[in-house]
Regions:
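Extracytoplasmic beta-strand/coil segments of soluble accessory domains associated
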Residues: 58-60, 69-74, 78-129, 133
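Short acidic/polar hinge/loop motifs at secondary-structure boundaries
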Residues: 129-157
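Membrane-embedded beta-barrel scaffold of Gram-negative outer-membrane proteins
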Residues: 297-323, 483, 489-495, 499, ...
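Gram-negative outer-membrane beta-barrel transporters
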Residues: 437, 546-549, 566-665, 704, ...
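C-terminal beta-signal and adjacent terminal beta-strands/loops
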Residues: 551, 601-604, 655-667, 688-737
């Protein structure tokens, strides 16, 4: 199959590159028209609000007719040291956030009614390449790029499936700041102190000399936490070297290192949360992450009309979760062994893209063709660890773990084509198609233990479990946009989506949680349309509606364990679901409205989303018309910013309506692993001032000290309710040259 795909791509590439000179002649004859088309394309940053859209064509990617956002970090007042998602993503409509990690070591966001857990419903990238544990089998992101290093965060919704793969949520790309071309050396040193023993040191050097440019940073974090047993020690480093061979060819290599260890205080029951959200239920739970990312990027401008981009990337990483997974209403018996879940990831892949401009009906159009090859290998073990409270991530029997031992190999080969057909100066249509071949397998065993009511072992067997599933399919989509003048446009898109089952959906040993052994892949589509526009530094808006159809949706229901008779969460293909929603964002500078030359800025923004997400029938008709879990009906974020020269201050209010944590829509439970998540609201204030090489930034998050939670979990870092951070403050000192 891989040779067929490579041959298809090679044939298409050569066909486009070897076109005769008639296209060139046509372009020359229509040069005036082509120039006009270039003028109306948005600049990379069309306002100072910190939010924009992506251009129709960015490098070798096509975004015309798609719902996109670009967050410009440098324009934000936010707690960047802690990667505060509530502030960083405040202007992105429809984003639901897990807020249980005050250090920012991991973030969880979901869009349009998709689960926020570790951004697993987005294809997550850094500088254009994958960063998740396994893009197919385990698309969770244990590594979060430091916001202080980022130029912008690029977001593409469900239409991303054609260019970036099969995730329903779309694609998120963290694009780091480029090295300055006019300095041999530049530096950015930011030191942050905050509540609960939080320390963050971010140190960056970058520059250019001749044909070589470089960018490197090191970040250290320490966090004691607002609950006991929450200590974090965190090390993150990045290095990049780019060699510009000539004016048309460049080669860049990136390396990212991450290592951290954190203690986890465990989850709470509803009663424990009401009585004292500061209390802890665990002192033996720990979590460790080790991440190594590497990539090589080649950009080649073949001629004025043709660009080629090639990326090779790899991941060598691991994560270990250690502790006691029992219900939070049960005491951790320190006389018993702890449980260790250990993963080792070794993945590598490559992507190649060819973008060509050509004349169509006397207007400039663009065609993009690309291919992807990816191989993943995950070793997952679960078994007993020692009885202590130390961070000792070692199995008692490493060669024969008590619960399970698996190898999860995976592979993915794909080719895709998208084309912007520019029919008039203002109207374009962008169809696309993607062919996918996916193989996921499991090779290993799990241990089956049955006990009687007295706890005596009746059956203890080692069960071999070897499975393999290979499938090929085609995804198609089409988008359109129509411009009104230069700065306003209507857009609409329809794209098919697909999501394969992941490793967690195959086997996990957890007393609170079981998995259906007959799970099926998820399919569906995303349709959206809207109206957006910008008036530079005065007004930006984007109003849209969407429909997300999700078939064979995997979710959690409540059932009774046939052996223990305890109520547990059971992961299965619950049903089909339908997410229907409206997303709206607008920001206006009221001073610029009356005085365009004023140095003062006084802007307000409103970010609103309404989502109706219900199960609509399928494998489990009993859940028809039940609400989909982790989908609040309403999310509102609004804020106000005042700025004058190098000083700015922002106040922000965020409201999220209530949501359920499982497909049965249970309101409460004694174990707290399922139940309702009540509505909550939070206020944040941040300010900053810069003078020459120096800057000071400060703020208070959760100003009113709201006590709330956004997540219930059946496993680590719980199980149970995971409380959000109370009121906390921070101060950052910056030296930048």
């Amino acid at each position: 199959m891989r040779f067929v795909l490579i041959n298809i791509f090679t044939f298409l590439s050569l066909a486009f590159i070897s076109q005769n000179d008639s296209i060139t002649d046509t372009l020359k004859k229509k040069q005036k028209t082509v120039d006009l088309m270039e003028v109306i394309i948005y600049t990379p940053k069309d306002n100072s609000f910190g939010i924009s859209r992506l251009k129709n064509v960015e490098g070798t990617a096509i975004y015309a007719g798609k719902k996109t956002e670009a967050i410009y970090v440098g324009d934000l007042n936010a707690n960047l040291a802690a990667n505060n998602s509530r502030q960083v993503f405040a202007k992105v409509a429809g984003i639901n956030i897990f807020e249980n990690d005050g250090s920012g070591s991991q973030i969880g966001i979901g869009g349009r009614g998709l689960n926020p857990n570790r951004i697993s419903n987005f294809n997550t990238r850094q500088n254009g390449y994958d960063i998740s544990a396994d893009a197919l089998g385990y698309p969770e992101s244990y590594y979060t790029p430091p916001t202080e290093a980022i130029e912008r965060i690029e977001i593409l919704r469900g239409a991303a499936s054609l260019q970036y793969g099969t995730q329903f949520g779309g694609m998120i790309n963290y694009k780091f700041n480029d090295a300055p071309t006019n300095k041999i050396i530049s530096g950015n040193f930011r030191q942050t102190g905050a509540s609960f023993g939080f320390l963050n040191s971010f140190n960056q050097l970058a520059g250019s000399a001749g044909k070589i440019s470089y960018n490197a940073f090191y970040q250290y974090k320490h966090y004691d936490g607002w609950r006991d047993n929450s200590t974090l020690n965190y090390h993150n480093a990045f290095g990049s070297v780019k060699y510009k061979v000539n004016s048309r060819l460049s080669i860049k290599g990136d390396y990212t290192f991450l290592n951290y260890i954190s203690q986890q205080p465990g989850g709470l029951t509803d009663k424990q949360f009401r009585d004292d959200p500061y209390q802890v239920t665990r002192n033996r739970n720990w979590f460790k992450v080790n991440w190594n990312l590497y990539s090589v990027v080649v950009d080649y401008e073949i001629n004025q009309r043709t660009k080629l981009n090639f990326i090779a990337f790899g991941l060598m990483a691991g994560r270990d979760a250690l502790g006691h997974l029992g219900r939070p209403d049960r005491v951790d018996d320190t006389s018993k062994y702890r449980n260790l879940l250990s993963d080792v990831y070794n993945n590598y892949g490559s992507e190649i893209r060819l973008l060509r401009r050509y004349s169509f009906l006397n207007y400039q159009s663009n065609v993009l063709i690309g291919a992807r090859a990816y191989k993943g290998s995950t070793v997952r073990k679960q078994g007993d660890a020692d009885k202590t409270s130390r961070a000792n991530f070692s199995f008692m029997n490493p060669n024969d773990p008590e619960n399970s031992s698996y190898l999860f190999p995976s592979s993915n080969y794909a080719v895709f084509v998208e084309n912007i057909f520019q029919f008039t100066k203002n109207w374009s249509i962008t169809p696309g198609v993607r062919f996918e071949n996916i193989t996921t397998s499991s090779e290993g065993y799990y241990r089956l233990v049955n006990r009687d009511l007295a706890g005596n072992v009746l059956l203890d067997m080692r069960m071999p479990d070897n499975r393999s599933n290979s499938r090929s399919f085609v995804l198609a989509g089409i988008g359109t946009q129509y411009k009104i003048k230069t700065n306003y446009e209507f857009y609409a898109n329809f794209s098919q989506n697909y999501r394969s089952i992941n490793f967690n959906d195959m086997r996990v040993n957890n007393p609170n949680y079981q998995v259906d052994p007959n799970l099926k892949d998820e399919t569906g589509f995303t349709a959206d349309g809207g109206f957006r526009g910008v008036v530079k530094d005065l007004l930006y808006f984007d109003v849209s509606a969407f429909l997300l159809q999700y078939n064979n949706r995997i979710g959690t229901i409540l059932t009774t364990d046939t052996l223990t008779y305890n109520v547990i969460r059971y992961r299965t293909n619950v049903s089909n679901s339908r997410n229907l929603g409206v997303e709206a964002f607008t920001e206006i500078d009221w001073i610029k409205l009356f005085s365009k030359e004023s140095k003062h800025k006084f802007s307000t923004f409103v970010n609103f989303s309404f989502i109706n997400a219900i199960y609509t029938g399928g494998q489990q008709p009993a859940f028809e018309n039940k609400k989909v879990e982790y989908v609040p009906d309403m999310i509102v974020r609004t804020g106000i910013t005042y700025a004058y020269k190098k000083f700015s201050v922002t106040g922000q209010y965020a409201y999220t309506s209530e949501q359920f944590s499982d497909a049965t829509n249970a309101v409460s439970s004694s174990s707290a692993i399922y139940g309702i998540i009540p509505a909550y609201s939070v206020i944040d204030v941040s300010a900053g001032y810069s003078w020459k090489y120096f800057g000071v930034f400060a703020g208070v998050n959760n100003v009113t000290n709201s006590l709330y939670f956004t997540r219930r979990t059946e496993g680590y870092p719980g199980p149970g309710i995971l409380p959000a951070d109370p009121m906390n403050g921070y101060v950052t000192l910056q030296f930048k040259f």
